[in-house]
């Protein structure tokens, strides 16, 4: 057994100023590429994303885009992660400002409807991606399914908190309640985006009230949710966050 020198702490040392500037610039460039790719994916779908297409919309070379991701697959996964982070910020974390129970659950649904309204002209990557990758396997599908599952878990947790507060029947299956709420959003997206039904948002709101009433809850109708087809804050404009949903 040979003697080895003590481990170096070079990796923990701060980068020289020029190195930091290069690192920050590289991170900013990658973030700009992902932002452009997310906007493109909302129009043409995840499957339509390619290194060449993103290079064209960003004005970069293909090799420049490739250097940040290494593959088309990693580019797609990066877009899914970014969409997930922004979705959490605009829908989930905003609702966390409300109290436990029905106020938080209602805020989740209201925020989700606002987001769906904002995506009528661009599309929801969770929904369009499910159509594109439902019969496929691989890392892209896994990343997409993991993001959706994380969000569904957060929704179910909000239902369980409402049950714990005695605002929804504790005998009810929280998975079933969350399933029905999720179904409303899917129906809203289909009716508003594909069928251009101007009453889709109001019908989704009424459906949510019916779900709560059926399971022993009551809800105050929101006043801030825009009507179907009206503009709302675009998802791609929401600041990014890297937190995981809390269990609180």
Per-range role (PLM):
Residues 58-69:
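Short hydrophobic/aromatic patch on the recognition helix
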Residues 36-37, 58, 162, 178:
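Small-residue (primarily alanine) positions within well-ordered alpha-helices
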Residues 104, 118-139:
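Amphipathic alpha-helical segments used for helix-helix packing
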Residues 139-149, 163-210, 215, 219-231, ...:
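Hydrophobic/aromatic-rich alpha-helical bundle segments in the mid-to-C-terminal region
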Residues 1-44, 48-57, 74-77:
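Basic, helix-initiating cap at the start of DNA-binding domains
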Residues 28-39, 43, 56-57, 74-97, ...:
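Alpha-helical structural segments
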Residues 1-28, 218-248:
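N-terminal intrinsically disordered/low-complexity leader segments
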């Amino acid at each position: 057994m040979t003697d080895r020198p003590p481990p170096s702490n070079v990796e923990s040392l701060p980068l020289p100023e020029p190195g930091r500037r290069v690192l920050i610039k590289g991170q900013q460039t990658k973030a700009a590429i992902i932002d452009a790719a997310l906007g493109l994916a909302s129009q043409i779908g995840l499957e339509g994303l390619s290194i060449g297409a993103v290079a064209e919309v960003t004005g970069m070379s293909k090799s420049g885009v490739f250097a940040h991701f290494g593959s088309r697959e990693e580019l797609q996964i990066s877009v899914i992660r970014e969409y997930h982070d922004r979705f959490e910020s605009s829908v989930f974390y905003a609702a966390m400002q409300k109290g436990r129970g029905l106020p938080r659950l209602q805020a989740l649904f209201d925020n989700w409807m606002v987001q769906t309204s904002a995506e009528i002209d661009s599309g929801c990557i969770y929904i369009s991606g499910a159509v594109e990758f439902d019969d496929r396997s691989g890392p892209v599908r896994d990343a997409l399914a993991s993001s959706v599952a994380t969000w569904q878990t957060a929704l179910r947790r909000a239902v369980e908190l409402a049950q714990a507060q005695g605002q929804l029947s504790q005998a009810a299956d929280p998975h079933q309640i969350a399933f029905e709420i999720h179904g409303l959003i899917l129906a809203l997206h289909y009716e508003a985006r594909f069928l251009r039904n101007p009453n889709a948002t109001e019908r989704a709101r009424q459906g949510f009230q019916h779900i709560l009433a059926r399971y022993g809850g009551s809800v105050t109708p929101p006043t801030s949710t825009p009507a179907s087809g009206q503009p709302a804050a675009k998802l791609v404009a929401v600041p990014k966050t890297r937190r995981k949903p809390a269990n609180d």
